[in-house]
Amino acid sequence: MAFKQLFAAISLALSLSAANAAAVIEKRATCSNGKTVGDASSCAWFDVLDDIQQNLFHGGQCGAEAHESIRLVFHDSIAISPAMEAQGKFGGGGADGSIMIFDDIETAFHPNIGLDEIVKLQKPFVQKHGCTPGDFIAFAGAVALSNCPGAPQMNFFTGRAPATQAAPDGLVPEPFHTVDQIINRVNDAGEFDELELVWMLSAHSVAAVNDVDPTVQGLPFDSTPGIFDSQFFVETQLRGTAFPGSGGNQGEVESPLPGEIRIQSDHTIARDSRTACEWQSFVNNQSKLVDDFQFIFLALTQLGQDPNAMTDCSDVIPQSKPIPGNLPFSFFPAGKTIKDVEQACAETPFPTLTTLPGPETSVQRIPPPPGA
């Protein structure tokens, strides 16, 4: 596992232990809006929060702008390679905002195609509020997740200096990469292992694709793209039957539902012996999904940074709403049953799920951000 990130997270948690509770209380500050925070510098982020909730996320919606903001966090953060540094080459700065500062370079990289639109939408907020691009990308991603029902309470730390050069190409995994390639890449970036790779991919629960199939945009990865739940982990294990658009695109394989896309890397990671059981473990297990993603998101947003030199401003991030009560945590979409599951975990049986009533599920597209 990513022991460096785990150690940092534990160290931060210990700083808030009961032994230091009195000191923590003394340090809390009250902002002009009446909210209390652990550090007075966090107060300025409430203005940023109000602004982006209204003017970027359209009143706090878990829509296309939220999905792309979450994607931007990963593509900025994962662009770091200690292996390249060991060879005397620049290996990228991780979560440093380079994808926004050098957007003319980095958004032209193949895995970053389409991110130029969310970068253009976010840039004016960075300029208006005077925050660093790295901090803003992490903040917008955390707020975006809070807009998706079921998401964990996200952590947010400030203190990322602006990037001084663009990250090199080739550091962001592609949909057509093999499982070995992707595991090796995340291990190089942050000593993440194959289980933590699965945790990262939980973000696909609230995601859609605009650029894999050139004939259609806004294709979700699962049937509940506006909810942070485990449906992504259910539906990626269902047998693919058709393409939602033209088909035959690099990095795309058949999906089980009309209107839903499946990328090759998700398909293979869900079925690889090293990752299949961890993948299945999220089915009908919302608490594990929430805990593991909360941890991995923080670890990603601190890649290339010194966590001990950062300021915890997590108080500013809203809590997400619960999953709607009329839906189980995991289910088979209408028209699907256990017979459609391609069982890959040899250790435990696939969980027992109910099938939603009604005609076969057809997944609605998500309109992409303006200009995409």
Curated annotation (Swiss-Prot):
Keyword terms: Cleavage on pair of basic residues, Disulfide bond, Glycoprotein, Heme, Hydrogen peroxide, Iron, Lignin degradation, Metal-binding, Oxidoreductase, Peroxidase, Signal, Zymogen
Cofactors named for this entry: heme b; Ca(2+)
Chain ranges passing through the membrane: none
Composition bias type Low complexity, residue spans: 350-361
Family the UniProt entry places it in: Belongs to the peroxidase family. Ligninase subfamily.
Keyword Transport among record annotations: no
Annotated Ca(2+) 1 binding sites: D76, G94, D96, S98
PANTHER family assigned: CATALASE-PEROXIDASE, THYLAKOID LUMENAL 29 KDA PROTEIN, CHLOROPLASTIC-RELATED
Pathway participation: Secondary metabolite metabolism; lignin degradation
GO BP term, pick one: lignin catabolic process
Entry function: Depolymerization of lignin. Catalyzes the C(alpha)-C(beta) cleavage of the propyl side chains of lignin.
Classification lineage: Eukaryota, Fungi, Dikarya, Basidiomycota, Agaricomycotina
Name of protein: Ligninase LG3
Cross-referenced CDD domains: ligninase
Residues that coordinate or bind Ca(2+) 2: S205, D222, T224, I227, D229
Catalytic activity: 1-(3,4-dimethoxyphenyl)-2-(2-methoxyphenoxy)propane-1,3-diol + H2O2 = 3,4-dimethoxybenzaldehyde + guaiacol + glycolaldehyde + H2O; 2 (3,4-dimethoxyphenyl)methanol + H2O2 = 2 (3,4-dimethoxyphenyl)methanol radical + 2 H2O
Record: residues binding heme b: H204
Disulfide topology: C31-C43, C62-C148, C277-C345
Residue stretch(es) of the prosequence: 22-28
